[in-house]
Amino acid sequence: MKLILTQEVTGLGAPGDVVEVKDGYGRNYLVPRGLAMRWTRGGEKTVDSIKAARASRAVRDHDHAEQIKTKLEAQPVAVKVRAGAGGRLFGAVTVTEIAGALADASGEQVDKRTIVVTNPIKSLGAHEVSVKLHDEVSAVVALNVIPA
């Protein structure tokens, strides 16, 4: 089955890639979850639009990624969240909140899909997250979670 990926699928490809997969995998997993759509002749326009959107979000090159990395790692980023009396949060800090705090602190827009949180952040204090800026460049950002 020939599919066009609409989101990144680990081990398969990036958005806009045309891939060949087994029928059951495509029909039962990728298409229902919105990770891919069936390939058609008119789908080439979709591929072009997905690749154009991805290129606009992507970091230009390795040097630009290094510049963004130095900006992000320069100082800790404060994230304000609602917390209870014992310092426990109501929920967890989301990647959307982290991306917003990074944009406010550094002035650089970071795609939330590039932020990797190894363990859910559910308490106040200092935490670390990594941001994959380029295939070869990732930044480790210090977060200070403070009560709002």
Swiss-Prot record:
InterPro entries in the cross-refs: Ribosomal_bL9, Ribosomal_bL9/RNase_H1_N, Ribosomal_bL9_bac/chp, Ribosomal_bL9_C, Ribosomal_bL9_C_sf, Ribosomal_bL9_N, Ribosomal_bL9_N_sf
GO biological process: translation
Pfam families assigned to the protein according to its UniProt record, in alphabetical order: Ribosomal_L9_C, Ribosomal_L9_N
GO CC annotations on file: ribonucleoprotein complex; ribosome
GO molecular function: rRNA binding; structural constituent of ribosome
Annotated Gene3D superfamilies: Ribosomal protein L9, C-terminal domain (3.10.430.100), Ribosomal protein L9, N-terminal domain (3.40.5.10)
Family annotation (HAMAP family): Ribosomal_bL9
Function: Binds to the 23S rRNA.
Protein name: Large ribosomal subunit protein bL9
Organism: Nocardioides sp. (strain ATCC BAA-499 / JS614)
Lineage: Bacteria, Bacillati, Actinomycetota, Actinomycetes, Propionibacteriales
